Amino acid sequence: MKVQPVLVNKDNYSYLVIDEKNKVAIAIDPCEPNKVISSLSSISSDIKINSVFTTHHHWDHAGGNNLIKTIIKDINVYGRDERFEGITKKLENNEVLKIGSLKIKTLDAPAHTSSHVLYLIEDENEPNQVKSLFTGDTLFIGGCGRLFEGNPEQMYNALYNVIGKLPDNTLVYVGHEYTLKNLEFAKTLESENENKELYNFYDQCKEKLANGEFTVPSSIAQEKLINPFMRCHLPSIYNHYLKENPNSINPPSPIDVLGFIRSLKDKF
């Protein structure tokens, strides 16, 4: 299994997940289909996209679905509900599909939108290969999505109980290249003495971007080290909440802390 990021719409990530043995590929959030198809053509002329998997209904993720259906006849377009443009099949939570040797599991993660889903993908022909998680606008490198249709409790559940309980070595492929901005915010919450890993990781990501490289993938282990929204249970993060809410229980609810730092990030 090969994962090829495709930068579209300035800072969106679409992805090709390629089963090279069976010469089949799936596209994740191909909002600019021609760029995604061109990227695959540069890899191989023999591999064809047969399915689209969409994380949520926003135009910069689902907005290419109808177009790709006109380019690739009989393509399957998967999503969670009728708001997902052009879907041909509605998926359910924990539903598993097999395409070639790829096994794709749908995980509900309502928060950014009420029907947002994640896709956990592995290659059955490569049992020792690390799984890959496609998070759309739920989890970003160093951040999380805005709560347009959900609430802090739902985002906490998505980050801690859905994503956070997957194996730490799971690779994370996010929906936007927001990495440096997210890490700059994270650095306002934790000093270098409190989180040396955060500052080292920021420098690494800055160098990657300067060299024309992607910052994806991250990993769940990495996010637990540097992402403030997955560190709400730690004093270095929740002390900011306590300063503004001195009458709160100590330690405070990590859900309340997440909501608080999300409101700070909204204004950052």
Swiss-Prot record:
Chain positions recorded as substrate binding sites: H176, E177, Y178
Cofactor requirements of the protein: Zn(2+)
Pathway: Secondary metabolite metabolism; methylglyoxal degradation; (R)-lactate from methylglyoxal: step 2/2
Keyword Transmembrane helix attributed: no
Record Gene3D superfamilies: Ribonuclease Z/Hydroxyacylglutathione hydrolase-like (3.60.15.10)
Reactions listed under catalytic activity: an S-(2-hydroxyacyl)glutathione + H2O = a 2-hydroxy carboxylate + glutathione + H(+)
The keyword Zinc is annotated on this UniProt entry: yes
GO process annotations (BP): methylglyoxal catabolic process to D-lactate via S-lactoyl-glutathione
Cofactor note: Binds 2 Zn(2+) ions per subunit.
Binding-site positions, Zn(2+) 2: D60, H61, D137, H176
UniProt-annotated binding residues for Zn(2+) 1: H56, H58, H112, D137
EC number of the protein: 3.1.2.6
Keywords: Hydrolase, Metal-binding, Zinc
UniProt-listed PANTHER family: BETA LACTAMASE DOMAIN, TENZING NORGAY, ISOFORM C
Function statement: Thiolesterase that catalyzes the hydrolysis of S-D-lactoyl-glutathione to form glutathione and D-lactic acid.
Protein name as annotated: Hydroxyacylglutathione hydrolase
Organism, scientific name: Dictyostelium discoideum
Gene: hagh
